């Protein structure tokens, strides 16, 4: 079940104010954020946002196709290291 339309999309207030300030200046800086639950809005297109993945900040360049998605979708939190090489031998 999605979010109610009358509420609107969730965006962190601090992140939104930083984006608006940069849009007024016309400046393109990397913005650090821990808010993975924030929805990407059309005002964010063209900016690079460093999203925290639990260990470090992953730079995410926002394009038009990303609008409506969450920031956390583009910063994976887990790394797949592969299965064990001798996995077939241990099954026998």
Swiss-Prot record:
Disulfide bonds: none annotated. Keywords: Ribonucleoprotein, Ribosomal protein, RNA-binding, rRNA-binding. GO terms for molecular function: rRNA binding; structural constituent of ribosome. One of its GO terms (cellular component) is cytoplasm. GO terms for biological process: ribosomal small subunit assembly; translation. InterPro entries: Ribosomal_uS19, Ribosomal_uS19_bac-type, Ribosomal_uS19_CS, Ribosomal_uS19_SF. It comes from the Bacteria. Belongs to the universal ribosomal protein uS19 family. Protein S19 forms a complex with S13 that binds strongly to the 16S ribosomal RNA. This is Small ribosomal subunit protein uS19.
């Amino acid at each position: 079940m999605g979010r109610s339309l009358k509420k609107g999309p969730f965006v962190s207030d601090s992140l939104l104010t930083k984006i608006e300030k940069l849009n007024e200046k016309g400046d393109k800086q990397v913005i650090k954020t821990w808010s993975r639950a924030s929805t990407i809005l059309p005002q964010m297109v063209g900016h690079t946002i460093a999203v925290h993945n639990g260990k470090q900040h992953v730079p995410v360049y926002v394009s038009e196709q990303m609008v409506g998605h969450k920031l956390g979708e583009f910063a994976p939190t887990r790394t797949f290291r592969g299965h064990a090489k001798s996995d077939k031998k241990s099954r026998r």
